[in-house]
Amino acid sequence: MTKPVLQDGETVVCQGTHAAIASELQAIAPEVAQSLAEFFAVLADPNRLRLLSLLARSELCVGDLAQAIGVSESAVSHQLRSLRNLRLVSYRKQGRHVYYQLQDHHIVALYQNALDHLQECR
């Protein structure tokens, strides 16, 4: 017996009740979902992703980051502020220079996993 194939716009209505299954399922809390949405919204900017790609390799100052992605230091500082607010990057001051690095290994893993996924889908 073959499974039916759905055409665009078709839906399937489940037969029977699924109360037992549904009672065991639990979605994340609304406030957690909101935090995740804000997190991914910050990552939705191409220049921020380019900055993360550079910081995944090395600690860099604002001037180096600006030159590497071809935007002003002011624009880089603005993007870094958004990343810093979500604790994706941290910084240290050395004299007049401020050096940025990714906050922790979770950010590197998230970035690398997303890249791997995109390459597998090609």
Swiss-Prot record:
Changing C61S: Does not abolish zinc binding or metal-induced derepression. Keywords: DNA-binding, Metal-binding, Repressor, Transcription, Transcription regulation, Zinc. Zn(2+) 2 binds at H117, E120. Zn(2+) 1 binds at D104, H106. Residues 62-81 bind DNA. SUPFAM superfamilies: Winged helix' DNA-binding domain. Pfam families: HTH_5. Residues 28-122 form the HTH arsR-type domain. PROSITE patterns: HTH_ARSR_1, HTH_ARSR_2. GO terms for molecular function: DNA binding; DNA-binding transcription factor activity; metal ion binding. NCBIfam families: HTH_metalloreg (NF033788). PANTHER family: ARSENICAL RESISTANCE OPERON REPRESSOR ARSR-RELATED, HTH-TYPE TRANSCRIPTIONAL REPRESSOR CZRA. Transcriptional repressor of the expression of the smtA gene. Binds two zinc ions per dimer. The complex of DNA and SmtB is dissociated by zinc ions. This is Transcriptional repressor SmtB. It comes from Synechococcus elongatus (strain ATCC 33912 / PCC 7942 / FACHB-805). The lineage of its organism: Bacteria, Bacillati, Cyanobacteriota, Cyanophyceae, Synechococcales.
